[in-house]
């Protein structure tokens, strides 16, 4: 076998491989003979079909199969010999089989050689927060509102009231589609409506008819309404006030607390809030480290890996439609390309961090991750057992652990400053509520 390697562009390589033609001819001949022995054709006894008839019927297909096998086998031998690491399947271009040799070309991309740089330039502001009694009280107040009952009142509407109304919206005196409703129910302060709508209702009583003027946000989903000033004529048909449950042991029982009453509920709330906080803190630091790593290391990436990641993201997006995708057109790759490129770069860079630091997934860390995740379920032990019995899920969790370890390794060389933050402020930002 003779091999020549050519760099075409970027990470693309072209291998020209030449092998003795007799290698193919012998295999073709052997396969034709094998087919002749087992072929059953009309007019011929089993195993007595002439070679010429086999060649006529199956010769072309047999040669194509053998040629493909020879190219694949010799390609593998060639990349091992040349120490090349393909990032995707090769494209084979077979040449002529005339003469003493068979030559073919294999075109493919290789993985980039990643050399980590600028790790000491990564700047991380590490937030430090904890759950205190006031934070637990805020959560309890939220739970009270979620379990509130409502009753009609004869007074002006205030925040947190529920109201029923009829309304008609118009722009420049013309009604618009979706701007009219009857018996519409709304809780004031829920921010379901565009800015100014809910606050415009506060202070009005049942039976009031009034107008409010609002402006649709520039990022409103309906293109024809973006940035438009609108007028709504509203008739308030009912105002309902919230009756919040008392915070006591009976309230605790609403959340499945069988023993310990209110104190047990508060302890459970604190535990859940602490778990969510720790996850959010970890995610915040990880994102800063990853962003800094990408900024310091602009690497070339194989198109094949990006295309594969695009397909994964596209499939995930389609699944979010709940399986109702039969008649949907395929989502364009452009929607996912930027995210796919970022994910491929992160994977390659973190892979090099793991390799450089000789990291192995720590069993204790894997178990802690599983237990932490399982604690959010009603029966944590059942979830832990399910993970431990599923090889694929366990491998996924080991990958998560390795990624954590890689981020921690990068933190050691990063410029880290610690900043105290309040729980509510941090979590609002982390969840996009700020």
Swiss-Prot record:
Residues 160-245 form the PPIase FKBP-type domain. This is Trigger factor. InterPro entries: PPIase_dom_sf, PPIase_FKBP_dom, Trig_fac, Trigger_fac_C, Trigger_fac_C_sf, Trigger_fac_ribosome-bd_bac, Trigger_fac_ribosome-bd_sf, Trigger_fact/SurA_dom_sf. The keyword ATP-binding does not apply. Keywords: Cell cycle, Cell division, Chaperone, Cytoplasm, Isomerase, Rotamase. It catalyses: [protein]-peptidylproline (omega=180) = [protein]-peptidylproline (omega=0). It comes from the Bacteria. NCBIfam families: tig (TIGR00115). It holds the Pfam family Trigger_C. Belongs to the FKBP-type PPIase family. Tig subfamily. The gene is tig. GO terms for molecular function: peptidyl-prolyl cis-trans isomerase activity; protein folding chaperone; ribosome binding. Consists of 3 domains; the N-terminus binds the ribosome, the middle domain has PPIase activity, while the C-terminus has intrinsic chaperone activity on its own. PROSITE patterns: FKBP_PPIASE. It is found in: Cytoplasm. GO terms for biological process: 'de novo' cotranslational protein folding; cell division; chaperone-mediated protein folding; protein transport; protein unfolding. Its EC number is 5.2.1.8. Involved in protein export. Acts as a chaperone by maintaining the newly synthesized protein in an open conformation. Functions as a peptidyl-prolyl cis-trans isomerase. It comes from Shewanella frigidimarina (strain NCIMB 400). GO terms for cellular component: cytoplasm. It is an enzyme of class 5 (isomerase).
